């Protein structure tokens, strides 16, 4: 096979190997994202949405890859032969860049594994790994051959040995896509949720805080002297550094450990500000120390699993920046939900997705 040919793999297989947030936005539109943002701001889990996106992409990509194997078997090229062809192409660098992800899957690798296991070198270590893989497939498949026997796919007889090459390749493809999806959705959802949250609370987004700015404003993903925060709210010479993490029970202390290093005073827009800290996490475990840890640094931690979490954020911002608490007169959950729903109509979601 000629892996220097951009058309040697199905177009959809190459396209699904890497997608962008713009691809997701174009596919679903802002109305879908508005519903998701509303759900998150009212206590639902964002992963209910992103997991479906991931599984859809996985199914489309896995089936396209599987179909590729079937087509090649019809041409008389076995999965094991494809494995060896891909190995040689990677070793000799005889491929175009766009084909690299699929070639790595064909040798049961991901880009991250290529970095970590092979140290980005397709040399002797790669040869040893390929030989050992072939030996292990032959050894392990013997224990299942009598039970499974010969497999028929698309009218093609497939030995269990060849089927092992297919499923290992699909496994690597799955690892790549799950890692890609986690990174993709995590990055833009942080900005989308925080941007929407602070906009409905009356703060204006600024790419950078300028000197002399007196309005209620916020920035996203700021970094100063290696102390990074996901957002910074500023007003009246005071500021709140915000860290958000879509991480589960047991890992939330990681977020607080990071933000606890922020200074109590910091220069923002050429002016020294009193700094407070707020951590937004997905859920707080029953035995988590994070609430007490936050209090020790005069900070606040809220969990997005709490239907009232937006009201708690509003109250904390009001107390620290001396601004109106827009939800103070809305103790009922239905009133909070109604406020959020109405306010989201005026939020430019596309702006925050594309940041």
UniProtKB/Swiss-Prot annotation:
InterPro entries in alphabetical order: Restrct_endonuc_II_CfrBI
Gene Ontology MF annotations: type II site-specific deoxyribonuclease activity
Keyword match Repeat: no
Highest rank taxon of the organism: Bacteria
Record keywords: Endonuclease, Hydrolase, Nuclease, Plasmid, Restriction system
Phenotype upon gene inactivation: Loss of restriction enzyme activity.
EC class: hydrolase
EC number per UniProt: 3.1.21.4
GO BP terms, alphabetized: DNA restriction-modification system
Reaction(s) the record says it catalyses: Endonucleolytic cleavage of DNA to give specific double-stranded fragments with terminal 5'-phosphates
Record-given protein name: Type II restriction enzyme CfrBI
Originating organism: Citrobacter freundii
Name of the encoding gene: cfrBIR
